[in-house]
């Protein structure tokens, strides 16, 4: 019997299988690709304090980072992207890069830097899931790392402190969410009725923002106005994580009428398209190599998507 693939990741709350973005991404992709993982939830211990979570352990090999874990699963013939075209594969890479550049800094700020959220939600949660004496200093250490990452990537002159950077990162995050909503349109998933790695990454980034009981949530309020993204998360939770989470729907605000796509959204769309075209050209040779047909996962049937509108790539 083959050794099971073991996944170490953060545990869940707020009706989510995990509260951490990267852990959610890997858990979702494994479900989409039909990978049977032995999931072990971890807390901060002396062994894991410097470790990268999530982690895959298999036959003496340890794999970290979501992109590397997804590549590992593909090599094991668990490939949720098998049926994507070269253009769709390039789009996937471009949108994942956009998430990391535009949305991740705002998520870090929301959960780890915003004083009200950190004091009333983030610190108490991670303190309660960390053993003594790590619970006294580990949350503060993570907050410092989050702040350093934000300033390192976003504090370009003349934006030299977190107060000045804050407006910039939230503005970019809202533009990113608008673009994702526009790209998703009326589809169930970003490439139709079948979820792929892009859906896993988007789910991992926006699900905690939707579900967490944030005392201070300007980005959460903006996301709750994008009804199709809320429904997107709700569909994934219902179809793939019913046993791991409570069977209640996302508490999303009613659909709010939006203004036509503004100039910033058009520029962001053009940027993603340009990066996607470049990746597609670089990817041609790789995709021409032979591939194994992946395992398929039979998801629970969901209601048909509403009338489809064409959306920009």
From Swiss-Prot:
It is found in: Mitochondrion; Mitochondrion outer membrane. CDD domains: GST_C_Metaxin1_3, GST_N_Metaxin1_like. GO terms for cellular component: cytoplasm; SAM complex. It comes from the Eukaryota. Keywords: Membrane, Mitochondrion, Mitochondrion outer membrane, Protein transport, Transport. Coiled coil: none annotated. The keyword Mitochondrion applies. Pfam families: GST_C_6 (PF17171), Tom37 (PF10568). Residues 280-313 are annotated as: Disordered. GO terms for biological process: mitochondrion organization; protein transport. Belongs to the metaxin family. Part of a large protein complex spanning both mitochondrial membranes termed the mitochondrial intermembrane space bridging (MIB) complex. Could function in transport of proteins into the mitochondrion. This is Metaxin-3. It comes from Danio rerio. The lineage of its organism: Eukaryota, Metazoa, Chordata, Craniata, Vertebrata. The gene is mtx3.
């Amino acid at each position: 019997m083959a050794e099971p693939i073991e996944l170490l990741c953060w545990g869940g709350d707020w009706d989510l299988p995990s509260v951490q973005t990267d852990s959610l991404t890997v858990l979702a992709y494994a479900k989409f690709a039909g990978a049977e993982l032995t999931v072990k939830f971890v807390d901060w211990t002396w062994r894991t304090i410097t470790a990268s979570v999530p982690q895959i352990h298999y036959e003496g090999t340890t794999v970290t980072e979501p992109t590397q874990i997804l590549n590992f699963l593909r090599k094991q013939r668990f490939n949720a992207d098998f049926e994507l075209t070269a253009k769709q594969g390039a789009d996937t890479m471009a949108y994942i890069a956009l998430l990391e550049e535009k949305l991740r800094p705002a998520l870090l700020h929301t959960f780890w830097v915003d004083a009200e959220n950190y004091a009333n939600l983030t610190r108490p949660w991670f303190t309660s899931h960390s053993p003594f004496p790590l619970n006294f200093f580990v949350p503060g250490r993570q907050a410092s790392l989050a702040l350093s990452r934000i300033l390192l990537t976003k504090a370009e002159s003349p934006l030299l402190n977190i107060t000045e950077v804050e407006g910039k990162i939230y503005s970019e995050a809202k533009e990113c969410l608008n673009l994702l909503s526009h790209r998703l349109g009326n589809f169930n998933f970003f490439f139709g009725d079948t979820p792929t790695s892009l859906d896993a990454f988007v789910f991992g980034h926006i699900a905690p923002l939707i579900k967490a009981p944030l005392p201070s949530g300007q980005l959460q309020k903006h996301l709750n106005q994008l009804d199709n993204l809320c429904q997107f998360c709700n569909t994934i939770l219902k179809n793939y994580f019913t046993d791991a989470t409570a069977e209640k729907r996302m508490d999303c605000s009613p659909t709010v009428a939006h203004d036509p796509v503004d100039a910033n959204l058009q520029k962001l769309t053009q940027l993603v398209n340009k990066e996607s075209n470049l990746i597609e050209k670089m990817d041609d040779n790789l995709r021409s190599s032979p591939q194994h047909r992946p395992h398929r996962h039979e998801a629970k049937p969901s209601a048909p998507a509403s009338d489809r509108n064409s959306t920009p790539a």
